[in-house]
Amino acid sequence: MPVHPELEGYFLATGFADLLPLALKMAQRDGYGPEEMIEAICMVADKAKTYPPTRNRVAWFATVFREKLRQARAQMKAYERKTRG
């Protein structure tokens, strides 16, 4: 999956730039797009402020990012349905 122009910036800004390759693999495997990834990384950053990873940062990120990808897709689909009427 080619890196979306803004995606790397979001990962840099949130402090998870080193985990971008893992995030790309996860998203590609599960069929998520760049917009969903951007939304998810923002939600991961919010969660990290409240519940920062304390032991295994990579495992924490993988678990939370997968959860937030699903949440981002659901929110985007709900918004799409709402705006279509």
Predicted feature residues:
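Non-catalytic, well-ordered alpha-helical scaffold segments
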Residues: 5, 20-21, 35-38, 55-63
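Long, charged low-complexity interaction segments
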Residues: 1-32, 84
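Generic structural signal of hydrophobic/aromatic residues within well-ordered alpha-helices
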Residues: 7, 22-26, 37, 69-72, ...
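Short cationic/low-complexity microdomains
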Residues: 32-44
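Short, cationic/aromatic linear interface patches
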Residues: 41-85
